[in-house]
């Protein structure tokens, strides 16, 4: 039975309250039951410390606690990360299968390595290399000459075209397509287009996670590359020859045009659009629905808008924009009174 004392030991936290309270579930800070554990990381939810029904709450080391004796508090440096650790260790429902279904189809030979799972109606191409504990769920397709590293999970309906290289500890969610042709056509004098052959590939380094229904195009030449630790939300388009730097995270419906180079540790909001052939500096943060028409060269800055502006300038511009109807009325009155 999981107790508050065990959680405090796992997290090296300071326990305040009943060390023997049992924990059977997790909950949000504004809900819960006496046998549930929750956390407070964002100050805007601090009010719920007075009303939460959770029996155990993770808080920051400097958190001022309410005078409640019915809650056990555990003080930790980072409640959000600590909660993730507890979720993963004690409450993660994912249990991947093992074995090779008789209904999967393998073209050629593959090594039957430890922990391998090939689900029903999955298709494995020729000369495919699969690492230890790879999980390929039903109806996934792996093209010829692909490499998939250890502990990588490929969920149902994923399509991975030939020559793709995927590292260790990656997760690719259902409906994603990796390695399809980049959008390359040469305009002719008569207005028609000739397709440019896309002869490159896609490389996903270690610890990459791709959400559902993303599309990552192969390079025209060379490689489209997602560096170590990249995390993509659902419904994201990554065009040919894009490079996404280490530990960059991108929210849903973003579109990254061809040959864009995103730096390390960038944070990209939902529905952001990038023009092609630009470079984005390390640590850049871009707000949702922004349009990026040119390179960002200064690292660690925040941007928003379409076209983008520095965050503080954008806020000032919004204040002026909201005043435009009033200013228009005043100008019209001045014109009338000339």
Segments from the language model and where they lie:
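Terminal amphipathic alpha-helical/low-complexity segments used for targeting or macromolecular assembly
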Residues: 1-103, 164, 169, 175-176, ...
């Amino acid at each position: 039975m999981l107790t508050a004392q065990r959680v405090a030991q796992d997290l090296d936290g300071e326990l305040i309250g009943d060390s023997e309270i049992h924990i059977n579930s997790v909950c949000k800070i504004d809900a819960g039951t006496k046998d549930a554990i929750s956390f407070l990381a964002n100050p805007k939810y601090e009010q719920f410390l007075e009303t939460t029904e959770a029996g155990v709450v993770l808080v920051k080391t400097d958190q001022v606690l309410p005078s409640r004796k019915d809650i056990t508090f555990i003080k930790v440096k980072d409640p959000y990360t600590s909660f993730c650790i507890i979720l993963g260790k004690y409450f993660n429902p994912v249990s991947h299968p093992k074995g090779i279904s008789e209904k999967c189809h393998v073209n050629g030979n593959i090594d039957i390595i430890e922990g391998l799972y090939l689900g029903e109606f999955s298709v494995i191409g020729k000369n495919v290399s699969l690492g230890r504990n790879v999980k390929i769920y039903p109806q996934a397709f792996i093209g010829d000459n692909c490499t998939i590293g250890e502990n990588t999970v490929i969920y149902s309906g994923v399509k991975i075209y030939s020559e793709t290289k995927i590292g260790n500890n990656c997760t690719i969610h259902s409906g994603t397509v990796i390695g399809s042709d980049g959008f390359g056509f040469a305009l002719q004098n008569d207005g028609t287009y000739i397709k440019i052959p896309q002869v490159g590939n896609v490389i996903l380094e270690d610890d990459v996670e791709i959400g559902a229904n993303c599309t990552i195009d192969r390079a025209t030449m060379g490689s489209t590359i997602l560096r170590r630790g990249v995390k993509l939300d659902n419904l994201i388009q990554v065009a040919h020859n894009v490079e996404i730097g280490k530990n960059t995270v991108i929210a849903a419906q973003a579109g990254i045009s061809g040959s864009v180079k995103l730096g390390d540790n960038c944070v990209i909001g939902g529905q952001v659009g990038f023009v092609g052939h630009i470079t984005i500096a390390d640590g850049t943060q871009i707000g949702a629905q922004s349009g990026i028409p040119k390179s960002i060269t200064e690292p660690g800055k925040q941007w928003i808008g379409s076209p983008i502006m520095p965050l503080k300038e954008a806020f000032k511009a919004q204040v002026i924009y909201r005043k435009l109807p009033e200013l228009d009325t005043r100008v019209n009155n001045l014109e009338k009174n000339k």
